[in-house]
Amino acid sequence: MRDVALSNRVRVFRAEHRLSQADLASAIGVSRKTISTIEVGRFVPSTIIALLLARFFRVPVEEIFSLEDEG
């Protein structure tokens, strides 16, 4: 298996919607820290959280998350 990393555009979508991390977290039922750690790439969200974010922003999950080759 290749080395890959999950990249995301959560911060971009959140900024476009003028939401704080706390606002977004509350809207999808997670903690602000969860949103923060997803945005900086320290936490890989569960499928459920990824789908909740996509549903909230009304975009396909692939517009928020993508795989990038490492190395």
Predicted regions and their residues:
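A short, Lys/Arg-rich alpha-helix, primarily the initiator
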Residues: M1-E16
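Alpha-helical residues within the helix-turn-helix
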Residues: A15, S26, R55
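Short alpha-helical DNA-recognition segment
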Residues: R18-S36
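Key DNA-contact positions within bacterial/archaeal DNA-binding proteins
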Residues: K33, F43, E62
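DNA major-groove recognition helix of helix-turn-helix/homeodomain DNA-binding modules
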Residues: I48-E63
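Short amphipathic recognition helices of helix-turn-helix/homeodomain-type DNA-binding modules
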Residues: E63-G71
